């Protein structure tokens, strides 16, 4: 059985995945509270805040991967 490859990007990804678990839990909890009292503006604001924080975190993860992809592509291009 082959051993899965592990490298720097895997470590970076794992750190993002660990952080996003907590944020996902917070978003879910805020949504559950909002669903119980949909007319409460404080709960709506809390949900929007948590969702925005989650989106920012995921965007950072996506941008990090894209930067490394671009760097790798530039390195490969320089060898041609």
From Swiss-Prot:
<comment type="function">
    <text>Component of the type III secretion system (T3SS), also called injectisome, which is used to inject bacterial effector proteins into eukaryotic host cells. PrgI/SctF1 forms the external needle filament that protrudes from the bacterial surface. Is probably involved in the transduction of an activating signal, thought to be mediated by the distal tip of the needle filament, to the secretion machine. Required for invasion of epithelial cells. Required for the secretion of the effector protein SptP.</text>
</comment>
<dbReference type="InterPro" id="IPR011841">
    <property type="entry name" value="T3SS_needle_YscF"/>
</dbReference>
<comment type="subunit">
    <text>The core secretion machinery of the T3SS is composed of approximately 20 different proteins, including cytoplasmic components, a base, an export apparatus and a needle. This subunit polymerizes and forms the helical needle filament. Interacts with the needle tip protein SipD/SctA. Interacts with the needle adapter protein PrgJ/SctI, the secretin InvG/SctC and the minor export apparatus protein SpaP/SctR. In vitro, the needle protomer refolds spontaneously to extend the needle from the distal end.</text>
</comment>
<comment type="function">
    <text>During infection, can induce innate immune responses. The needle proteins interact with host TLR2 or TLR4, and induce signaling by NF-kappa-B and/or AP-1. This activation is MyD88 dependent and results in increased expression of cytokines, including TNF-alpha, IL-6 and IL-8.</text>
</comment>
<protein>
    <recommendedName>
        <fullName>SPI-1 type 3 secretion system needle filament protein</fullName>
    </recommendedName>
</protein>
<keyword id="KW-0653">Protein transport</keyword>
<dbReference type="Pfam" id="PF09392">
    <property type="entry name" value="T3SS_needle_F"/>
</dbReference>
<dbReference type="GO" id="GO:0030257">
    <property type="term" value="C:type III protein secretion system complex"/>
</dbReference>
<dbReference type="InterPro" id="IPR037203">
    <property type="entry name" value="T3SS_needle-like_sf"/>
</dbReference>
<dbReference type="GO" id="GO:0005576">
    <property type="term" value="C:extracellular region"/>
</dbReference>
<keyword id="KW-0964">Secreted</keyword>
<keyword id="KW-0843">Virulence</keyword>
<dbReference type="GO" id="GO:0009986">
    <property type="term" value="C:cell surface"/>
</dbReference>
<comment type="similarity">
    <text>Belongs to the SctF family.</text>
</comment>
<keyword id="KW-0813">Transport</keyword>
<dbReference type="InterPro" id="IPR021123">
    <property type="entry name" value="T3SS_needle-like"/>
</dbReference>
<dbReference type="GO" id="GO:0042802">
    <property type="term" value="F:identical protein binding"/>
</dbReference>
<dbReference type="GO" id="GO:0030254">
    <property type="term" value="P:protein secretion by the type III secretion system"/>
</dbReference>
């Amino acid at each position: 059985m082959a051993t899965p490859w592990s490298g720097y990007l895997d470590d970076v990804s794992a750190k993002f995945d660990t952080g996003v678990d907590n944020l996902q839990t917070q978003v879910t909890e805020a949504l559950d509270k909002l669903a119980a009292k949909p007319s409460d503006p404080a709960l709506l604001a809390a949900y929007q805040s948590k969702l925005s924080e989650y989106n920012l975190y995921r965007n950072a993860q996506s941008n990090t991967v894209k930067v490394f992809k671009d760097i790798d592509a530039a390195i490969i291009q320089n060898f041609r």
